[in-house]
């Protein structure tokens, strides 16, 4: 296979078959809720897909909220840090310039890096057009490298590979190659399959490395390169569930920021187009930045929070990067404060659950959404950060049931008396752990409590927690040991997980790392006999 191929960007993109095998060696045969958005075109960047390589911009070391802003903060990557002075790269996706200083390019184009490969935006020279400008570093990979192959998805998890492959539109044999989660230096081939008993499912094959540098799935059939292995199995199943037919489609990743040095931006660069929702402290809009880029814009009412405190916190928030967190792009730091983030096409999870689509969601989809949220929060946990306002209204939904955590960290900055009293009308008491509501002790463990409440929102399709109870009553009852009963049709094992999140002593509550693992393996380890019901 040619090594200049890159991943397709959109599920709608025409899928390509693999080229014939070559030189095969070896024997062998076989806060701010957003409402459901209007039907509008998606942003140019797409909304889904594994995060790609980037190196965070250099920053002044500053400890803030337990988070060291000089740390390198990354989510699972397609390509790792670069070594060996590689300067020629190949474009993995099309990119349309957003400013006068960045560079448009097409997928497959070869680019010469002009400056060093640090930061999120690199100065590059196109070998096709002769033009020079800044490019998003996660849209390119070193020429003739494994990262430049369209089927190579890098450091994504087994569960994430299954999310991508279990699309009903994918034919049998749709595949990707990823890093092994369990064996350092090894890879995994993930392939979609179908049978009458299991329906659509995914098989995973470990690709082992020879001491000589070659690769094999079965020792009788060995290859000099991963490219040769993929090309061979595209012609011969040879023990696999099916021959490899089509590279798994995915969307372009978000760029890291809107453009080089586009952090504090002028208000005039934003156009507010469609109002998506309104909360106690502001509004949410779909809009455009610089006339080129689809974004979501939160506008805060003057007096909601101190601009100075917000800007300080935002410097930390923008370094939190994970594929299950809504990315903070830019800010307008003078009042009224504007917060510019990636746009999520399906709006808030709360509205999504209560809407038309919610009726058709069953437990497997709901548990998967919960696992995605837990994955984002496990990253927040690793970064020693605290969300403080985790609930369905602050989760955003994109295409293919992708869920991302939004509004992390903002709640701490709100200066409204009805909120800071913690028992005022604007405070989300029903989602808040007792030690946080009563004594202001907000930690990642109070976020775990809130996650347990969010699980009830998922399993009841958006019902308000503690139905029939007012805030003051909820606080009193919970302090006396009351916990919500198991929702109708919800398995006891899932209710038991909720109750673990609601343990009185914060340190006895599970970690988000545990919650993620439990939910990702739920239908294999906990409820293998699950059968769909009327609502779940």
UniProtKB/Swiss-Prot annotation:
**Reported effect, residue 298 to M:** Kinase inactive. Abolishes ubiquitination promoted by CBLC
Which PROSITE patterns did the record assign?
Answer: PROTEIN_KINASE_ATP (PS00107), PROTEIN_KINASE_DOM (PS50011), PROTEIN_KINASE_TYR (PS00109), SH2 (PS50001), SH3 (PS50002)
Residue(s) carrying Phosphoserine: 17, 75
**Name of the featured protein:** Proto-oncogene tyrosine-protein kinase Src
Domain SH2 span(s) in chain numbering: 151-248
Query: One GO CC annotation, please?
Result: actin filament
List Phosphotyrosine occurrences by residue.
187, 419, 530
Q: In which tissues is it expressed?
A: Expressed ubiquitously. Expressed in the skin (at protein level). Platelets, neurons and osteoclasts express 5-fold to 200-fold higher levels than most other tissues.
What further fact does the record state? Answer: May be involved in blister formation in Pemphigus vulgaris, phosphorylated-SRC is abundant at blister sites but not in normally adherent tissue, which corresponds with loss and disruption of CDH1 in cells adjacent to blisters. Phosphorylated SRC is increasingly abundant at pre-lesional sites of blister formation and occurs prior to changes in abundance of CDH1 and DSG3.
